[in-house]
A protein has these predicted regions:
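Bacterial N-terminal signal peptides that target proteins for export
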Residues: 1-6
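An extracytoplasmic/periplasmic, membrane-proximal ligand-sensing/linker region
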Residues: 160, 167-168, 177-180, 184-193, ...
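Ligand-binding clefts/hinges and TM-proximal coupling segments of bilobed small-molecule sensing domains
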Residues: 131-142, 211-280
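Short beta-strand-centered segments that line the small-molecule binding cleft or hinge
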Residues: 73-75, 93-101
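Bilobed "Venus flytrap"/periplasmic-binding protein-like clamshell domains
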Residues: 21-47, 51-52, 103-163, 167-169, ...
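Pocket-lining segment of extracytoplasmic ligand-binding domains
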Residues: 80-83, 89-90, 113, 149-243
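N-terminal signal peptide c-region/cleavage motif recognized by signal peptidases
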Residues: 13-15
Length: 303
């Protein structure tokens, strides 16, 4: 039976009205968060018709945290140490929707560069990231802990980093994670990675309890044939605790069911799983109640 036009229009309208639009704060163009946010939103939107995730460029983690706390965005991507610090504050209103990926911090130099270690960069101009980025915080933690004074270059947007290295205005660019756009661009042009030594990793971890040993797998970037050891921490998709339990449940379910789709869109998103969320959360109560409900139903945590 064919429905009258007005009936079809009514059902279409009610379906649209029922769909919840969620704003996801990412970071400045050219960095890893906007790329991840695009893949994440596409996967969720394709999987869950009741939700529509829309990305918004921000200054990065340092802006996403206060925006989330104030309820001005629904979801926010927050990196490593900043996420750990925000979640550890007494009475924090922030909750975890999902773990994103672990981000090993690295420097990249030109292939013909004489620099072979972090200490070699002493006194040299080094791009550490953008003003609001969690990657920048990690870079500062590494050079400051190791007592390596560098000429710290802060960018307006992450995409400005590679040209500074290629032109010789910077000796190195700091970044983190698998599939980071600036690393990909520079590695294709013969860039070479520099990470902390075993002794340096030990020193960094002793001074920065929010960090952990993290490995950059072999072949994560062009020309990177061996795995590299470094330090880093998990990044998360966070929300406010006042975020709808129904919507967080739907998000968790969509993330779980679209796991292979998300991994196919972005290599580092292979780590975006509900199982990793359980493992990476500092405490179970920091996971949003709606997500916990789905985790119980999926058998990922005990009831």
């Amino acid at each position: 039976m064919r429905l009258p036009f007005f009936a079809v229009s009514f059902f279409s309208m009610t379906s649209t009205l029922a769909q919840q639009t969620l704003v996801l704060g990412t970071a400045t163009p050219g960095g890893g968060f906007p790329v991840y946010g695009a893949a994440f939103s596409e996967a969720i939107n394709a999987q869950q018709p009741k939700l529509r995730v829309e990305t918004r460029n921000t200054k990065g983690s340092t802006e996403n945290v206060p925006l989330l706390e104030a309820g001005r965005i629904d979801l926010g991507l927050v990196a490593g140490e900043l996420a750990s610090a925000a979640l550890s504050k007494p009475g924090t209103p922030l909750r975890i929707v999902t773990a994103m990926y672990a981000s090993p911090g690295m420097f990249i130099v030109k292939g013909d560069s004489p620099y072979r270690s972090i200490s070699d960069l002493e006194g040299r101009p080094v791009v550490l990231g953008t003003q609001g980025s969690g990657i920048t915080v990690l870079g500062h933690a590494i050079v400051d802990t190791l007592g390596v004074p560098v000429g710290k270059i802060t960018l307006e947007k992450a995409a400005d980093g590679p040209p500074l290295l290629e032109s010789g205005k910077a000796a190195a660019v700091f970044g983190a994670g698998v599939g980071w756009p600036a690393f990909t661009a520079l590695a294709k042009n013969g860039g070479r990675f520099i990470g902390p030594s075993a002794a340096e990793i030990k020193a960094i971890l002793a001074r920065n309890p929010g960090l952990q040993p993290v490995t950059l797998p072999a072949n994560s970037y062009p020309g990177q044939g061996a795995a590299l050891q470094s330090v880093g921490s998990w990044s998360y998709v966070l929300c406010n605790k006042s975020f709808s339990e129904e919507n967080s449940y739907l998000l968790a379910k969509a993330i779980h069911l679209s796991q292979s789709t998300l991994a196919g869109k972005l290599e580092q998103a292979r780590e975006t799983t509900m199982a990793n969320t359980v493992a990476a959360a500092p405490r179970p109560d920091l996971i949003h109640p709606g997500v916990l409900k789905y985790l119980r139903e999926a058998g990922l945590i005990s009831r």
